[in-house]
């Protein structure tokens, strides 16, 4: 990877019929393992680029620097249709979703969802949503993602891949205090990893990210533990 000018790596997705793979960036373990330091972002210790690969040649064809709008691009997902050229990447710290289309030799990359940061008195900067996971339903109809700090999971209709439309939102834990108790219990942490059932009707959500980050942002989780929550999804009308 050093010969390819790739400083960090994290997630990847590939479409063999398109001879294409997309990879993302996080940071070096020595940066994120102790916890999150905002100053590390300004020191370029976290990634902000995505890379498009030629699978056969095992070479990077194109690298996109997502800039300030694309800080820490972790998860990437493409549509499940093996002939599709559409995909998404979630910029965790910037809390934006980018759409990409690899149909042309020069891929198109565009921000299509912006989760606004919120001013709060307990955080030194406007609180980002912190998008930690994204997924596409098996029928390629919906995009889901989790905002770990805000505390919501969202569902978007992606029938038109480059123009997602919000169709559902559920609150689970989070720092904004908007989430209800579940079965009489306050949920520690926020929606982090998500997995959808094959029929698309149940979204499973866990609330722990990484122990040092859990302790930093959700200290109550150390004693109360994390949780797994199931969210019922409307696959016909959205929501």
Model features per residue range: what roles?
Residues 17-19, 83-85, 139-141, 199-201:
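Short coil/turn segments that connect the beta-strands within blades of beta-propeller domains
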Residues 27-28, 93, 149, 159, ...:
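Residue-level signature of beta-propeller blades and closely related beta-rich strand-turn architectures
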Residues 44-49, 94, 150, 164, ...:
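A detector of repeated loop/turn-to-beta-strand junctions in beta-rich toroidal repeat architectures
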Residues 7-11, 72-78, 123-137, 181-198:
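Signature of short aromatic-glycine-proline-rich micro-motifs recurring in repeat-based ectodomains
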Residues 24-45, 100-102, 206-225:
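Short, conserved, GDST-rich strand-edge loop motifs in beta-rich repeat architectures
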Residues 52-58, 99-112, 155-167, 218-220, ...:
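Short loop/turn segments immediately following beta-strands, especially the blade-tip
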Residues 1-7, 60-71, 107-127, 167-186, ...:
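Surface-exposed loop and turn segments in beta-propeller and other repeat-based domains
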């Amino acid at each position: 990877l050093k010969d390819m000018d790739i400083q960090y790596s994290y997630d990847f997705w590939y479409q063999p019929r398109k001879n294409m793979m997309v990879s993302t960036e996080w940071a070096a373990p020595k940066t994120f393992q102790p916890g999150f330091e905002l100053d590390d972002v300004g020191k370029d210790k976290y990634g902000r680029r995505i890379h498009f690969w030629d699978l056969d040649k095992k070479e990077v064809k194109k690298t996109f620097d997502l800039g300030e709008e694309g800080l820490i691009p972790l998860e990437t997902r493409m549509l499940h249709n093996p002939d599709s050229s559409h995909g998404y990447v979630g910029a965790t710290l910037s809390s934006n979703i980018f759409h990409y289309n690899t149909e042309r030799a020069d891929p198109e990359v565009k921000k299509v969802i912006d989760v606004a940061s919120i001013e709060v008195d307990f955080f030194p900067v406007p609180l980002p949503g912190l998008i930690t996971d994204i997924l596409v339903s098996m029928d390629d109809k919906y995009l889901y993602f989790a905002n770990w700090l805000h505390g919501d999971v969202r569902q978007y209709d992606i029938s038109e891949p480059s123009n997602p439309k919000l169709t559902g939102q559920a609150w689970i834990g989070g720092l904004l205090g908007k989430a209800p108790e579940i079965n009489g219990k306050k949920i520690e942490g926020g929606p982090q990893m998500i997995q959808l059932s094959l029929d698309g009707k149940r979204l499973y959500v866990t609330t722990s990210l990484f122990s040092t980050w859990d302790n930093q942002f959700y200290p109550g989780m150390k004693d109360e533990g994390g949780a797994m929550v199931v969210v019922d999804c409307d696959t016909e009308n959205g929501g």
